[in-house]
UniProtKB/Swiss-Prot annotation:
It comes from Mycoplasma pneumoniae (strain ATCC 29342 / M129 / Subtype 1). Residues 4-78 form the S1-like domain. One of the essential components for the initiation of protein synthesis. Stabilizes the binding of IF-2 and IF-3 on the 30S subunit to which N-formylmethionyl-tRNA(fMet) subsequently binds. Helps modulate mRNA selection, yielding the 30S pre-initiation complex (PIC). Upon addition of the 50S ribosomal subunit IF-1, IF-2 and IF-3 are released leaving the mature 70S translation initiation complex. The lineage of its organism: Bacteria, Bacillati, Mycoplasmatota, Mycoplasmoidales, Mycoplasmoidaceae. This is Translation initiation factor IF-1. CDD domains: S1_IF1.
Length: 78
């Protein structure tokens, strides 16, 4: 029997809204989430390919893995 891949990894992602506080280096940012927690986040690949500019004060969507809630990926701008 072949194993079934139901893309469980994508379903386990947590997405929160946050505000960019500062640019740390290149594509790394410090983000203040809606629940007043500061985390570090980096640009997702599609955001990097589109060369979207993220500035301090922008509202963004941050995706987290359930294994590491201190590091996120910026997947979109609001």
């Amino acid at each position: 029997m072949q194993p079934k891949f139901n893309n469980q990894a994508k379903q386990d992602k947590l997405v929160l809204t946050g505000k960019i506080l500062e640019i740390i280096h290149g594509d790394k940012f410090r983000v203040l989430l809606e629940n007043n927690v500061e985390v570090d986040a980096h640009l997702a690949g599609k955001m990097r390919m589109r060369r979207l500019r993220i500035l301090p004060g922008d509202l963004v969507e941050v995706e987290f893995s359930p294994y590491d809630l201190k590091l996120g990926r910026i997947i979109g701008r609001k």
